[in-house]
Amino acid sequence: MAHRWINDLTPADITPRGAWMNRRQVMAGMAGAGLAAFAGSAQAETLEPNSWEEITSYNNFYEFGTGKDDPAAYAHLLKTVPWSIKIDGMVERPGDYDFQDILSEMTIEERIYRFRCVEAWSMVIPWNGFELADLLAMAGVQEGAKYVAFETLYRPEEMPGTRYPVLEWPYREGLRLDEAMHPLTLMATGIYGKPLPNQNGAPLRLVVPWKYGFKSIKSIVRITLTDREPPASWNMAIPNEYGFYSNVNPEVNHPRWSQASERRIGGGLFAKRQPTLMFNGYEKEVAGLYQGMDLAKYF
């Protein structure tokens, strides 16, 4: 089921402008606005154009190395065909789901989302994909499930970064079930109308726009429904710095730097930092998920 969310960003806000400003893509990027059920609340200022190369070369994907340019340099080693996703745990129809079979059942739409890294840099990216809720509906969520766990591919011969104990491999992440079912939560299959590049998490990655980027796990091979909070790689490695929730919050700093502002990629060396928005600008849509919670404690 597609088009359940109104997009408040426009093609002028996308990074880079030149890769998107043609009629087909502009119309696709705006098509969901009149059909969605959710209204975006935050207004984004116009961003300076950025190059396609920056989007596909400035990445965190430690399976290929810890440098920002390592994923672009080494991700060509990754073989993404064939690809399947194991869906198990508390589901009615567990099994190995072929990626192409999943695509054939989904309506692919384009979502223009802000992307905020925990390292205090940001972009605006037009993703292609489908709502995670639709994939979970395909598998059938059992009563009593409370969380969704995700796992990245672990294939050292194709992912040279996994040869080093930077993290405990494979990379793992998790969401509460209500977060996973939220209409903003996307399973991305592409960007800018093209298939997802390897360095950006091909062929299938999670995008949760109100959370820091490391929650948006890449190259997913397993999804598990469970009644217990699942392990998450950065939370396991440094729990006092990376919480399970990791919602974008300018009022809760990382122990080693401020989260009150961010550096927009493509803004230039002397560009002014931008104030970070609560929940990355999606407060109206998602704040209700955390009503009554101490967001400094459950960071």
UniProtKB/Swiss-Prot annotation:
**Cofactor entry:** Mo-molybdopterin
**Is Ribosomal protein among the key words of this record?**
no
Residue numbers binding Mo-molybdopterin:
N59, Y62, E63, C117, T152, N200, R205, S216, I217, K218
Q: Does the keyword Signal apply?
A: yes
**Disulphide bond pairs:** none
| Record's subcellular location | Periplasm
Catalysis performed (reactions): L-methionyl-[protein] + a quinone + H2O = L-methionyl-(S)-S-oxide-[protein] + a quinol; L-methionyl-[protein] + a quinone + H2O = L-methionyl-(R)-S-oxide-[protein] + a quinol
Q: Which UniProt keywords apply?
A: Metal-binding, Molybdenum, Oxidoreductase, Periplasm, Signal
* Post-translational modification, as annotated: Predicted to be exported by the Tat system. The position of the signal peptide cleavage has not been experimentally proven.
Enzyme Commission number: 1.8.5.-
GO function terms (MF aspect) = metal ion binding; molybdopterin cofactor binding; oxidoreductase activity, acting on a sulfur group of donors, quinone or similar compound as acceptor
Q: Which Pfam families match?
A: Oxidored_molyb
What is the protein's known function?
Answer: Part of the MsrPQ system that repairs oxidized periplasmic proteins containing methionine sulfoxide residues (Met-O), using respiratory chain electrons. Thus protects these proteins from oxidative-stress damage caused by reactive species of oxygen and chlorine generated by the host defense mechanisms. MsrPQ is essential for the maintenance of envelope integrity under bleach stress, rescuing a wide series of structurally unrelated periplasmic proteins from methionine oxidation.
The family assignment reads:
Belongs to the MsrP family.
Listed under subunit, the entry gives: Heterodimer of a catalytic subunit (MsrP) and a heme-binding subunit (MsrQ).
NCBIfam families, per this entry? PRK05363.1
Query: What name is this protein filed under?
Result: Protein-methionine-sulfoxide reductase catalytic subunit MsrP
Origin species, per record, is: Ruegeria pomeroyi (strain ATCC 700808 / DSM 15171 / DSS-3) (Silicibacter pomeroyi)
Q: Which gene encodes it?
A: msrP
